UniProtKB/Swiss-Prot annotation:
It comes from the Bacteria. Homodimer. CDD domains: GrpE. This is Protein GrpE. Pfam families: GrpE (PF01025). Signal peptide: none annotated. Keywords: Chaperone, Cytoplasm, Stress response. Residues 1-13, 23-34 have a biased composition (Basic and acidic residues). One of its GO terms (cellular component) is cytosol. The gene is grpE.
Length: 186
């Protein structure tokens, strides 16, 4: 019987030890579970924060695209406004010249003087906006700037020289707008 009692005491002792181990394990598991839940909640908050940031960034990008599109449309729509404002005095001068030419006491010289002034005004506006005239009389023919309307033999000029300009060309900011239309020596 004493063996039984010893066995019983050992079993009780083992059961108590197992209970303590089981309770410690349970407490450790609870602590780990609590830590994991806290980490999960933190990750959820971070994910929500990142989602909000991404949505705000997306909205900002959409607003930027819309503003940029509107700015480009406005720039295209009003790109010539400064140029037109500079040309208005030229137009006014032409109109005054036309009105003056219909008067009885007007002379050809006064009309010519008015036309010369208006022409100079117009050229000044063009120069202000970097529009240059291409007037190549006496220069070597350049197919990048000139358009040969015809070629004629000319003993007075070297071959490929511009003899006459039918229509002057124009360059805007070093870019050809219209080639000079010319007669070239053969």
């Amino acid at each position: 019987m004493s063996d039984n009692k010893t066995e019983l005491n050992e079993e009780q002792h083992n059961a108590t030890a197992e209970g303590e181990v089981s309770e410690e394990t349970h407490q450790a598991e609870d602590a780990v579970e609590h830590d994991l839940e806290a980490m999960l909640e933190e990750a959820r908050k971070e994910a929500e924060s990142q989602k909000e940031l991404a949505l705000r960034t997306l909205a900002d990008m959409e607003n930027l695209k819309r503003r940029t599109r509107m700015d480009v449309e406005s720039a295209h729509k009003f790109a010539l406004e400064k140029f037109v404002n500079e040309l208005l005095p030229v137009l006014d001068s032409m109109e005054m010249g036309l009105d003056a030419s219909s008067k009885e006491d007007v002379t050809i010289d006064s009309i010519r003087e008015g036309l010369d002034m208006t022409f100079k005004q117009f050229l000044d506006v063009m120069q202000k906006f970097n529009v240059e005239r291409v007037n190549p009389t006496g220069e070597k023919f350049d197919p990048q700037l000139h358009e040969a309307m015809t070629m004629i033999p000319s003993p007075d000029h070297d071959s490929q020289m511009v003899i006459e300009v039918f229509q002057k060309g124009y360059v805007l900011n070093d870019r050809l707008v219209r080639p000079a239309r010319v007669v070239v020596a053969e």
